[in-house]
Regions:
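Short, surface-exposed acidic/glycine-rich loop or hinge patches that mediate macromolecular interfaces
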Residues: 10-13, 42, 61-64
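Acidic, low-complexity mobile loops and tails
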Residues: 1-35, 47, 88-100
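PDZ-domain C-terminal substructure recognizer with occasional recognition of PDZ-binding tails
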Residues: 54, 58-74
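Short, small/polar residue-rich loop motifs at catalytic or cofactor-binding pockets
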Residues: 15-18, 43, 53-54
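A generic structural signal for short beta-strands and their flanking turns/coil linkers
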Residues: 1-3, 52-55
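Acidic, glycine-anchored pre-beta loop/turn
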Residues: 22-30, 61-67, 80
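Short hydrophobic beta/alpha edge segments that flank linear recognition/processing sites
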Residues: 30-49, 68-87
């Protein structure tokens, strides 16, 4: 199955988030609880952790770039050989955990 991780809207009055650091490259396998990406708002740091096992297949927002809340950050799949969709909209949502500091 194909999953997307989107920019979380967890901090009040924040419309966009900046990607600080990806904690894996394309093809990296994450287990539940692994840190996938660190994000930054003007008010807080946000850690995005995997809620289930998955393989990072496509990064849609590079480090240092800002993106609006709700926009997809990356695509992940259950297996490395799974074909990616033609459009991000056809991907499901990946269960993730967010930690705000």
């Amino acid at each position: 199955m194909i999953y997307q991780i989107s920019v979380p809207g967890l901090v009040a009055d924040v419309e966009e988030i900046r990607v600080l650091e990806w904690h894996g490259c394309i093809g990296h396998e994450f287990d539940a609880g692994d840190l996938i990406v660190e994000l930054e708002t003007h008010k807080a740091l946000v850690e995005v952790r995997a809620g289930q096992r998955g393989i990072l297949r496509q990064i849609l927002v590079e480090e240092g770039n800002w993106q609006k809340i709700g926009f997809p950050l990356c695509l992940m799949t259950d297996t490395a050989g799974e074909p990616l969709p033609d459009s991000v909209e056809s991907a499901g949502d990946l269960l993730v955990a967010f930690e705000i500091t």
